[in-house]
Amino acid sequence: MYLAIIFIVIAGLFILSAVLYRVLNSPKAKGRRGERTVAKILGETVPGRQYIINDLMFTEKNGNSRQIDHILILPSGIWVVETKNYSGRIYGNEQQREWTQVQAFGRRKNKFYNPVKQNTTHIYSLSDYLHTDRAIFQNVVVFLAQADISYIQSNAVYTAR
């Protein structure tokens, strides 16, 4: 009888830990952690007068919704920041539709939509929504430190360290 109870408790703990591991390591959870990290860095390192809006959601006239990770409002302009919490080597340039993430010593490759283009869409939408000239917006993509972006060809992409 006691063995059955012990077995059930151990099995329950094993299942609970497996579920927690999957939830905490889901792409959505990793993305949120990355966004929080970049928000903290922006708040601590940008000098002078600034306003930071994190996780802005708005709906366009056509009904499409947009989510922007960070907007940094400075006297020099409005910086629209897209955060990527990826690991491994990242390959791509501003003109390509898709970029490639390479992990596990080249054994695993994932394609993802070019974040510079993604953020350009955010800027167009925000500019239209605010009836503002696009020239005041700066496009910035930030990968967290575990990503190797040395293979990216873009002046808009940075690493948060």
Please place each PLM-identified region on the residue numbering.
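Surface-exposed interaction regions that form or flank ligand-binding interfaces
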Residues: 1-66, 73-78, 84-89, 98, ...
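Acidic/histidine-enriched active-site and ligand-binding environments that engage anionic O-linkages
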Residues: 91-93
